[in-house]
């Protein structure tokens, strides 16, 4: 094994260990995808009707699933029909056909493990309102886990088995693909650095651990996988062999059925295959290379058309066409897209709420270096491609009505484009090493805090962690949520804001009732003390955020529930505490010390890579 190959192996081990280290718990996005994985493996079908409602046995026993048929289910002899819910809590029956007498409407978002669902009326089946690529990627790992557990007599619906299986599925799909992508990033970075190892290694580690790619490499979402597959397509399309070009097309095609938006970068890569000069000769269209690349894309186009026809009745119908009306804006293109917003552009670039350059300041140098690439004739083609891919995802984000991305540790819709903004960092680490290194350290610290506490950061989105009197721009994911939870065990900045708003309302009620000012002050003081003491104890009322307890792995939601309401298990129970976890917590549960193995293994290996690559340069 050569020195470079050893470095690549160490990069893979360091990143895979880190991405596999965290289980981030449940949430709408990953719960719906995992339901499809289970349906494929356990039932051999795509419909997830039997994997969206979980109940506990009478007397507080194990979990069991409640099957649905045409959006209806039965509990204790009572028939219920699931209903969409709008912001005014109006119920709209999902199945609009006449209901039998005595059937009660039930709000879907309270009962189902996810609200990210689509219901197909002509089949009576539920599906995730997502592209299927992520689910397909998760099938191999879950297939192995499920059949091993079945041979051992384990119940896949048991809380701990379900939780572990979701973790294993995430590791064997998103975690693995993301780590492999880091190796390919390292190879591309070496090419763009002229073979220099240190700038390439530093850029790779800054990308892996200092950008929003890190937390999303630990989640069963599509974003890190899409970015990884597009990066892999870019790597292979730069090779000359027909096999590599086919593989480039396959990676691109898989990216497109993992995130439909990736179809546009797939076209950009086709243009690159057609026009790029890989051997330094004069530019001319290479239709052979492009045809081979597109031949690799074709099977995935056929696959998605077949999937859509089977599940939705037409190759051109998508799951989004059948999702909740809550996600649709009647005045928007495709129900989701509006004119680009300069305010959102500011939010996702420089704000402490979703700002890519605030949360990952090292990418400031990536953007600056991309400009330098554009001025360099030898790199101009690649620079234009990187700019086009990242710029496309940026444009989509600032035009999307759900720009914030829900519960998220950063601008998640930019994650698929991050590899292409980070690749130019090889220039920054070569020319401005100390400045870029300092910004990288700040970036890694931010991303580690966000990943170690909750990669699905709910600040300013979740009703339990939102102050409606504040603009999005003034919210701070790290300063108001991740850091206070890690350092003090509670998100005190937001809790204090919620307490202040609550007491203002209570004081207004007292004043309206004619209570004298001195008495109002006394009562409000007592109320403030009692409520603060309740938050210290972790009580969930009146502030649900008070039940969110640090310092690490704070998400109490499981893969069997869709909302933070502790319907299955009470706050601070063993189950809610272990719905999310990191590997170190098997030794130091609920402790900052749980990060020590991560710092020693991944941190030590990263240090070794940097030192070894610097020695090679010397």
Can you name each region flagged by the protein language model?
Residues 5-12, 294-298, 302, 379-391, ...:
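Signature aromatic-anchored transmembrane alpha helix within multi-pass, membrane-resident enzymes
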Residues 1-19, 170, 180, 286-296, ...:
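Start-transfer (signal-anchor) and selected internal transmembrane alpha helices
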Residues 236-239, 264-302, 367-378, 423:
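Perimembrane helix-loop-helix junctions
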